[in-house]
Amino acid sequence: SSAASDVYKRQGEEPSPAPRTYVLSSPKVRLVQTEEVRAQLGSAQQTLIDARAEPRFKGEVEPLDPIAGHIPGALNRPFAHNIAADGCFKSAEVLKQEFSALLAGRDPASVVHHCGSGVSAVPNLLAMEIAGLGSTGLYAGSWSEWSNTPGLPCARG
């Protein structure tokens, strides 16, 4: 029994769960697989944004994966750059300015976010939504999957 149900019992208000039906909507995020990323390398149809810290992106250090570096052509936007001094996301206006500068005229809809394992990319994805730049993609396999797939190109610097 949970602490919450114990409180209800003491108050004489035993909760009675009722069956519910939930209808799931289609995913709000476009999930991209390794083969799609590879097929679109260098294409204007895809703008990769890597959310890892700059030393990992540049290949100066790699504590987790067998190869250091990044997917060729990727831009670097460490996820922590989205957070203001108060610990919350920066304002929509600031995020829009920063991402627009990073994209340098590229279509925001072409963006596919990634990181080391797909987790740290999400703050960048959310930041672009907050900025009003629209829905973007997520390559959840990220650097871990890319660097562990034989034959895929890797870049450093």
What is each PLM-predicted segment?
Residues 1-8:
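Short, small-residue-biased leader/transition segments that mark boundaries at the very start
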Residues 50, 114, 139:
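Active-site-adjacent beta-strand anchor residues
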Residues 9-27:
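A short "linker-to-beta-strand initiation" element
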Residues 134-157:
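Cysteine-dependent PTP/DSP-like catalytic domain, specifically the C-terminal lobe
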Residues 111-113, 119, 125, 131, ...:
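C-terminal soluble interaction/assembly domains
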Residues 33-109, 148, 155-157:
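Positively charged, proline/Ser/Thr-rich regional signature most characteristic
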Residues 96-106, 119-131:
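Catalytic-pocket segment enriched in acidic/His residues
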Residues 85, 120-124, 145-148:
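Short active-site-adjacent structural elements
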